[in-house]
């Protein structure tokens, strides 16, 4: 395996929807050295499990009394307390997560009266937070009693664990459904051109709406933003010891707990990948003879964390003590290690291959669907369909022809998305090249006065920050535009197509339809017409039921808003 870019690349091997809103993704990264594989394996796992955040209910204080402490049942409610808490844990909350980082917990209130099926739509939520599925079930209230719950909302990651059982009068903990369920990785070695390389395989199991490939991009952006700050760490102390050992102490401030852990996890591996710095001018014979191919410039890394409070929030200072051996200075090792980390995680900014694969897969699926309908039409037009009634044949032909046209139009519309993808890929590829050019400048900094080096590093760090900000802005805008266009295409075609295809599937598997094949053409047409009539009635009932549900949701929203208004006026208390 190789590429023509002289750096690693990533590929999406498999992405699929599983049951219970779970999403699965499998990815490969190659070519990598053994040390690069180790760094990415540890860093990605840590960042995915702690860096992908979501809003979840974490605690419930229920006013209703339990009638049986052993069974944990609540008077007048069908579900057990354990089931109710699990239902709260499954509710997906949405909002602009960056607005909630470092804030909270927040309070939501469920205040309803039975008999009623309490749903997510009934919960009074703080501004900026919504439930993704309003119809999600919470509890069945079987008697005319109030059901009142005070809920705590927190920003959690996959390592956040709720306590189990009762916490006396304070209420009950809810085990939140994490955004990243599992991260597995494996490494496979191979030989190419007389050299040994490795491929790192990453498997991610996530909870909707967290998409595995976007989770990879998100944590990579977070790590890169973090290490462009590490580049500018405050230099606190420096001393020279015997045998050419240099010790430098640095401090990175205003970190969250998970960021401190990322730096410790990733930086140690990167520091031991650092090579000797470039000399200004040619090496002397004596210097050249003294170079050891196994020489390791970084001798040791010690980390210390100090927590502090600022404006009601808890932050950390991370102190880094780096030991190096001449001629490498501690600050040079830190810069080179940070550059290596930025280079490795920048590979996930290359999304052109993934976007192209996404388009090709959509077109492939719909082209296959189109082919199936063409085949059915061919059979209906052949002598093999002579035993089918004329009306039946015409109706089936019409349905397949309609679906064929829909598939063809959908493929055409998806093809029209390609210029949007191409424009996005062109812009992001250019940004990635700018970023890598800045990293090359960082590696090329020659030995000299620390103050001069520091000015250069600060300038390069600003370039890196600007490139990352430009990428993030472009990604958010274009991702929104492309997603909106894809959703519009889906909205236009999917419902009618799905209705027609589900009708065909039902008919072709229905016992009455199978019996049609045993009838003569006239009887077949009569029976087929009856099946069509029943299908029409079913659709009307489904539409009526759907409209009733919409009306019910609208009514429940109005009732919830009315309760909120009354509570704000002081007419209702929790």
Curated annotation (Swiss-Prot):
Catalytic activity: RNA(n) + a ribonucleoside 5'-triphosphate = RNA(n+1) + diphosphate
Keyword Transcription listed: yes
Region of interest called Alpha N-terminal domain (alpha-NTD), as start-end residue ranges on this chain: 1-352
Gene Ontology CC annotations of this record: chloroplast; DNA-directed RNA polymerase complex; mitochondrion
Enzyme Commission number: 2.7.7.6
Gene Ontology MF terms: DNA-directed RNA polymerase activity; protein dimerization activity
Domain notes: The N-terminal domain is essential for RNAP assembly and basal transcription, whereas the C-terminal domain is involved in interaction with transcriptional regulators and with upstream promoter elements.
Subcellular location: Plastid, Chloroplast
Family per similarity comment: Belongs to the RNA polymerase alpha chain family.
Biased composition (Basic and acidic residues): 551-574
InterPro entries membership: RBP11-like, RNApol_insert_sf
UniProt region (Alpha C-terminal domain (alpha-CTD)), positions on chain: 419-574
UniProt keywords, alphabetically: Chloroplast, DNA-directed RNA polymerase, Nucleotidyltransferase, Plastid, Transcription, Transferase
Keyword set includes Transcription: yes
Example GO biological process: DNA-templated transcription
Free-text function comment from the UniProt entry: DNA-dependent RNA polymerase catalyzes the transcription of DNA into RNA using the four ribonucleoside triphosphates as substrates.
Protein name: Putative DNA-directed RNA polymerase subunit alpha-like 1
Region (Disordered): 534-574
